[in-house]
């Protein structure tokens, strides 16, 4: 075969291959078009994109959500329209508390990537509830978890994750650099308050939908601090309480009214014989009720209620069923501070129903162990220790910690009332469990229902020490 024939032969072969490839590509395009037509049915077909497929590969789980997008509409499973959370409803009538969530974060963290945290709390928008928490910039079972018993450090941050999930780097959202914090949703956006900085010059940074909108400088230079639970939004305005001053004597307490992250009004409480820290607040028929911690001299809890103009009233829960820790045995209460075992304290909450009160408290009088809910039908105004209902939540033998209130608005639940809920922190590690090098916690939450509930114990349940502790 001469050179010209070779060239012609090679060219013919290349052309034949090219034609075959073109035919295959055309066939592939036709196949995809037919498949798409069958899948969508018609151009106007819509469907909810909610199919979730889980595959497993080499012991690593992959969560794949397949979304079919056609030429016209994608229908979401939930209406994301902004609303204004009115906060005008009264609290729902309840008979007890139903378990709502448990994240088991310490148990999961023995083997998985879970943040070292404390001060978790829950807050809900009209679409979802989220767990907020203060990380220590470290993971469980890692060397940086050493020494995390410390409250205030530059590594702490407010983050959030979906309620009931263990807080990890893979499901958590950064909110603010903070060692004291609060957050709430007004129906249009999240307000976050994060306090960080030195003890004598800390600054609260306010963010609205993630953007810095305002700052508040420590006015007493004595550890500016806030609620460690949700703030309260009513008719587009959000309210929070901050404390600055001694933890064992009279301090300064201010209420702030905030709209879209900007402070519109603030007042200082005239309460020389009261002590307000780490307030747990909730809306009730358009007003705000806060039940707080007296770390100075009260074993019963102080309260402050105020309207949207910040006109306020103050007092102490009168019941002889005392709510703080440490505390004396139940007995004769007072509408002023009960000073027996009144020093120190723990964050907690109560819900007022007329003259009655649901009191959440540790089961132990002297340590942060166990948790129970008690209904005292006259406890807001009367000083006896009689109660009608006691519901066990955490056994006396298991660790608890901080607790606080949160509510679910009618815009979320579809009810015509405000559903009361609460969370309990389950602290593990130091200072009580000295076999560890770290301090962290998991959390449980409950919501009020007007139906049957269970008495049981929902403890943290992690077996300590971890590998890093040995």
Curated annotation (Swiss-Prot):
Cofactor(s) demanded: Ca(2+)
Recorded GO MF terms: exo-alpha-sialidase activity; metal ion binding
Active site: 151 (proton donor/acceptor), 402 (nucleophile)
E.C. numbers: 3.2.1.18
Residues that, per the record, bind substrate: 118, 152, 277-278, 293, 368
Cysteines engaged in disulfide bonds, as pairs: 92-417, 124-129, 184-231, 233-238, 279-292, 281-290, 318-335, 421-447
Topology in the lipid bilayer: Single-pass type II membrane protein
Other information: The influenza A genome consist of 8 RNA segments. Genetic variation of hemagglutinin and/or neuraminidase genes results in the emergence of new influenza strains. The mechanism of variation can be the result of point mutations or the result of genetic reassortment between segments of two different strains.
Identification of the protein by name: Neuraminidase
Gene: NA
